[in-house]
Amino acid sequence: MLTDLFVIVIYFLAIFCIGIYAGRRQNSLTDYALGNRSLPWWAILASILAAEISAATFLGAPGEGYHTRNFTYAQLCIGTILGRIIVGRLFLKPYYDYKVVSIYEYLEKRFGLLTRRTASMVFLISRVLASGTRLYFAGILLVIAYQFLTGVTADASQIVLLYIAALVAISVATTIYTAIGGLKAVVWTDVLQAVVLGVSMLSALWVLFSHIPGGWSSISAAMNGGDDWKFFSWGTGEGLDFLQQGARVLGQEYTVWAAFLGATFITMATHGTDQDMVQRMLAAKNSKAGTRAVIVSGLLDFPIVIIFLFTGILLYVFYQYNPANLPADTPQLHVFPYFIIHELPNGIRGLLIAGLLATAMGSLSTALNSLATTATKDWYQGIFKPEATERQLLRCVRWGTAVFSLLLILVGSITAWYVVHHPEVRIIQIALGIFGYTYGSLLGIFLCCCTPHRSSAVSVVLTFNTSLNARASFPQSPFAALLISFDAVRMFSIGCYRLHSLSTASAVLTFNASLSARAPSA
């Protein structure tokens, strides 16, 4: 285990050195938040990939491969590529033209201050909840490792304390280099984290394959189900009428339709209207470099997802030949971390742990930087101190990083407590679903910006509120991904019209009230 600890210590030392080195010569908020718009596109590309692959993906995608034993999840990459092409061609140039630091400044220039404040607040709340929930995943491997090393079978309260300790350790380390170095530290540490992630996953694949007796012949023999190895699914069935076919298609998560409709709109929202992801694209020298980074990242998503899913498939085959090595009650999400701790040799195990830490810290640093930047630009400078000096802005954004870190630790700890006491909960759906309530409406607002028509701030905000209420009225819908696209289209269609009369505004408010009454209570 000393070799593993050595690998992890070297990783942390490298991260801190990069973060401190990157934090030199920062004289303005633009330097801190956008790296003075001077970062190379390939570094931004690596940073996008590192931010996308959270701890939830690192553990959840192999879990999907283990459970489904096919590659249908990967077809969603069709939509992610299309969505990024649209983002690069439609959104990035206006952001550069207006020289925004917070993308919600762009909404103010198009629709007024009220729209900017509304979108900014929605982002802050939803990002704290979503990133805090995802932070929980980073603690899973560390908790399993502690139990493996000590041989202690902890009770529920002890497990929660272990999670909290793990989340605090990861968050404090990430907060230090993020607060000191700003976006430059985030991007350049992400480059290292992307390399560590890639090497660790390829190492896991090599070990898995070498531990399966018989190699490919054994893998083929174990994978003999009707849906095994499948790449594409239309979601249709035999002997069903048109309506039944439609219901069946909409009720499935991974289909070609979900790829073209759901994944495309979701990617447009995540990479075009979310400060968390757009901020690094704005650090490129110009919009063309930012566009190149985001589109190439979409192309690389496909092989990355294939590697994660294939890892899960090999995990299934490995435990088919070694059933005694895996406890029968092991949750799907814990299969990969259990393999890492119990099966990998020294050194490679440390590399995989470093890989998980890389995914967690990459996503966390991105969230902290974007939250602090948005709060500083939209609220501290925008409302409380418009005349703030650059030194005051830098102090605010650094303290904001620490404050948001505490909030994310709090949300992550609550999530850990809830999952430990309710193990049947699918926390990945909760983490992803938080943004499902807001992404479609936010995307609709930004799409309205792409038209020559200038809606009033009141019409945009009222329509945005209506869309949120409509989405909240159907929280258990199985068509969550498609609802995001419907939300965006509805928001775009209605938001392009002005509310000229009191009667029209009254009608929208009445519709809001009826939807609020329809929404189930918590």
Show where each model-derived region lies.
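Membrane-interface loop-to-helix entry segments
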Residues: 1-30, 101-104, 108-143, 165-228, ...
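Extracellular loop-to-transmembrane helix junctions
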Residues: 2-23, 35, 39, 43, ...
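C-terminal membrane-solvent junction of multi-pass transporters and transport-like membrane proteins
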Residues: 28-45, 163, 183-185, 430-461, ...
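Helix-loop junctions at the membrane interface of multi-pass solute transporters
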Residues: 31-36, 63-64, 89-97, 104-110, ...
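Loop-to-helix junctions at membrane interfaces in multi-pass transport proteins
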Residues: 34-39, 43, 60-75, 108, ...
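Select transmembrane alpha-helical segments in multipass membrane proteins
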Residues: 40-48, 82-83, 87, 113-126, ...
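Helix-loop-helix module between adjacent transmembrane segments
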Residues: 71-179, 241, 245, 262-270, ...
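Loop-to-transmembrane helix boundary motifs in multi-pass membrane proteins
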Residues: 110-117, 128, 160-165, 376-422
